[in-house]
UniProtKB/Swiss-Prot annotation:
To phage Mu protein gp48 and H.influenzae HI_1521. Residues 1-32 form the signal peptide. This is Uncharacterized protein YmfQ. Keywords: Signal. The keyword Signal applies. It comes from the Bacteria. InterPro entries: Phage_Mu_Gp48 (IPR018755). Pfam families: Phage_Mu_Gp48 (PF10076). The gene is ymfQ.
Length: 194
């Protein structure tokens, strides 16, 4: 809540006992108001630090508490907003091994448009429809994260070394986090757009 010196002058004046001895225009009241306003504004700023999505001053303490940065993200490589998103994803982890849980994690990591394809259908048999996928029984342990079109990709240029990859794409942070969170008996495939 934004407050001004005038707000505190009115408040302090209203707290004075009634009578001719006390004046609302007392210089002591006007002198105390700026300090009280600063304390109030500082308290408001501290309240914003309690939320991992908006923390700035205490982000290092938040990250130390949550074990971040971890092996998914090298230290010093993220912007403040990316650090806040990763922190929010870790602090507000609701748990669960269902599609909604992983979609929420993708959204918290900045990929709200990503979708998930599951391969938990039965295996293909002679009585299966022609449009059914030809999946072996092992495919029930696979699931695919379809990344949105905004995923970064880098092409090889003339200035790159000869042993460079022709194209590099992917979101290593998202891949690392989801691989850490996925059930140990499943495999995640990450599909990126062309």
């Amino acid at each position: 809540m934004d407050v001004t010196n005038d707000d505190y002058i009115r408040l302090l004046s209203a707290l004075l006992p009634p009578g001719p001895v006390w004046s609302a225009s007392d210089p002591a009241i006007a002198g105390a108001a700026p300090s009280l306003t600063r304390v109030h504004q500082r308290a408001d700023a501290l309240m914003r630090e309690l939320d991992p999505r908006t923390t700035t001053e205490l982000i290092n303490r938040w990250e130390r508490l949550c074990g971040l940065p971890d092996e998914c993200i090298p230290a010093g490589t993220q912007t403040l907003r990316q650090r806040q998103q990763r922190l929010d994803a870790k602090v507000n982890l609701a748990g669960g091994i269902n599609e909604d849980f992983y979609l929420a994690q993708l959204a918290a990591l900045g990929r709200p448009d990503a979708t998930i394809t599951r391969y938990d259908k039965s295996t293909f048999t002679c009585s299966s429809a022609c449009t059914d996928a030809v999946n072996a029984p092992e495919w029930r342990y696979y699931w695919q994260v379809n990344m949105p079109a905004t995923t970064n990709s880098t092409w090889m240029t003339c200035g790159d070394p000869c042993d460079s990859a022709l194209r590099i794409w992917g979101d290593t942070v998202v891949e690392c986090v989801l691989n850490k969170l996925c059930p140990s008996h499943t495999y995640v495939i990450f599909k990126y757009p062309e």
